[in-house]
């Protein structure tokens, strides 16, 4: 046996080299991390399986096959505009994370892009949100509804933009969360939402002795009493001035009717005519005499 030359089968050597890849899920995660989360797990598994689960060969195959044909969109992370950013949050508390992003490329984003969870702690059941296609250099805010973990501590997760075909692009967005029992992030966001809702509601013009703590019926009765109180001096003066008759004006009109009803000249030849005048007799039951 000593000094024997043995030719090893290349296929057998390849199988031995694959024995070091113990877990396919670990290889997929490592492949995805090395590519900067530019490919989804299914795509990573495709290239790994094509190269017999050799990580180095799979990465080379990916760049050889994809690079000449890929037009990758561009995205730059601008800032974290979350309300209460930097504050800790209590356990099991809903909150909203908001980031400002920009299309930093020269072409518009393709339709169907989304912001997707790619690693770390997920913070709730939402793992992706749709994002509208941004024009070159356009800026937009993207919000994600999240929930803090049930235990206190420091947590982190990663999110990234993704095309409809599963191609990741742009900066990795990090979520770093401090969970404490006395955290104020949830309260801060609730107060901010109340203030926004109050400012958007139409304001009512308050007049008179309006009581904001009284029931609507009492306020309505108070307004009606101010307008229709029969015992008030203003109502008496208004009613008297409106409905009181004007006797002098009526008598003047009646006298004018009496004077202008018959006008006889002294030289009139009809001396046997009886002249009837009506002065102040318009209020009787028979203004023209009884028949």
Curated annotation (Swiss-Prot):
Location of the protein in the cell: Cytoplasm; Nucleus
Listed InterPro entries: C6orf106_UBA-like, Ig-like_fold, N_BRCA1_central, UBA-like_sf
Annotated signal sequence range: none
Modified residues (Phosphoserine): 215, 222, 265
Compositional bias segments (type: Low complexity): 257-276
Keyword Nucleus found: yes
GO cellular component: centrosome; cytoplasm; cytosol; nuclear speck; nucleus
Any GO BP annotation: innate immune response
UniProt keyword terms in alphabetical order: Cytoplasm, Immunity, Innate immunity, Nucleus, Phosphoprotein
Region listing for Disordered, in residue ranges: 199-291
Main location: cytoplasm
Stretches with biased composition (Polar residues): 212-228
Assembly notes: Interacts with IRF3; the interaction inhibits IRF3 binding to its DNA consensus sequence.
Function summary: Negative regulator of innate antiviral response. Blocks IRF3-dependent cytokine production such as IFNA, IFNB and TNF. Interacts with IRF3 and inhibits IRF3 recruitment to type I IFN promoter sequences while also reducing nuclear levels of the coactivators EP300 and CREBBP.
Protein name (record): Protein ILRUN
């Amino acid at each position: 046996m000593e000094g024997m030359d043995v030719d090893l089968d290349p296929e057998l050597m390849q199988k031995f080299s694959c024995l070091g890849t113990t877990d396919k899920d670990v290889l997929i995660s490592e492949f995805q991390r090395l590519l900067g989360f530019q490919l989804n797990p299914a795509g990573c598994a495709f290239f790994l399986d094509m190269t017999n689960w050799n990580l180095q060969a799979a990465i080379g195959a990916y760049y050889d096959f994809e690079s000449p044909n890929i037009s990758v969109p561009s995205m730059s992370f601008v800032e974290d505009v979350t309300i209460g950013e930097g504050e800790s949050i209590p356990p099991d508390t809903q909150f909203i994370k908001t980031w400002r992003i920009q299309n930093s490329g020269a072409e518009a984003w393709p339709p169907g892009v989304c912001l997707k969870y790619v690693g770390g702690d997920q913070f709730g059941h939402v793992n992706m949100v749709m994002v509208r296609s941004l024009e070159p250099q356009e800026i937009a805010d993207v919000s994600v509804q999240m929930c803090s973990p049930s235990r206190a501590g420091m947590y982190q997760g990663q999110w990234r933009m993704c095309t409809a075909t599963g191609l990741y692009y742009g900066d990795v967005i990090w979520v770093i969360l401090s969970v404490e029992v006395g955290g104020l992030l949830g309260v801060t966001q609730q107060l901010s939402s109340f203030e926004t809702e109050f400012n958007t509601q139409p304001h009512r013009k308050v007049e008179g002795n309006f009581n904001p703590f009284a029931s609507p019926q009492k306020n309505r009765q108070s307004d009606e009493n101010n307008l229709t109180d029969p015992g008030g001096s203003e109502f008496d003066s208004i009613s008297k001035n409106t409905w009181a008759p004007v006797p002098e004006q009526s008598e003047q009109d009646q006298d004018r009717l009496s004077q202008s009803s018959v006008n006889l000249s002294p030289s009139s030849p009809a001396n046997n005519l009886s002249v009837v005048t009506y002065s102040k007799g318009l209020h009787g039951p028979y203004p023209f005499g009884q028949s």
